[in-house]
Amino acid sequence: MPQVTLGEILAGNKDPNRVVGAFNIHNLEFIRGLVQAAESEKTPVIMMINEAVLKYGRIDCLGVAALSAAKSAGVPIAVMVDHGTDCAFLKECLDAGMDVMYDGSALPFEQNVAQTKEMVCYAHQRGRCVEGEIGTLGILEDGGAAGEQHLTTVREAVTFYEQTGVDVLAISVGNVHGLYHGEANINVERIDEIHAALGEVPVVMHGGSDIPSRLSTARCGRGYANSI
């Protein structure tokens, strides 16, 4: 199947009851398992590779393996670098044919905008997509603390999108990486407000591993079929 971009795979999801899942892979076994599961369920997926994992596995090894598997799959699969902060490395990934998430959420707003916009311009010249993030989850992917959680405001989301032109926007609405300590407290109303303000712009959430299915269903019922 022809390679698809992150933007295409999210824009192509018109089913209000379906979430597009994104799953981190670490090696060939993860790649094969994800492709087999996607084909079995006949559903498009996003294959994510953490920046540190890809630096270790190398673009010309792990990256090429992921791209090759996606292209030969029987369902649409987008390949993207997850939570990247190294702009030079991310540009190499874009050159190789991957989409990227540039995560400048820990930076001051203006710097996040400037860095993300630079990545967007570079990616669009190559027909690739960029996901940006505004707001912080409070917990890193490895479970370490990343400071206080900062929920994305509607104004921040709109301003960030208008100034960067990102293809996909990741937001913070109570979601965290890994397991929750107690009940997950997802601000569904904030998602409503951001979605209404941004219209057709794909809005995604990271840290979906421990979000209860009832909350995922609630998001889908409101039209948020695009979630990571």
Can you name each region flagged by the protein language model?
Residues 207-210, 228:
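Short acidic/histidine-rich active-site segments
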Residues 4-16, 26-52, 60-76, 84-202, ...:
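Alpha/beta enzyme core
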Residues 24-25, 207:
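Conserved residues at beta->alpha junctions
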Residues 56:
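Cofactor-binding active-site loop characterized by glycine-rich and histidine/acidic residues
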Residues 80-83, 206:
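Conserved acidic functional residues
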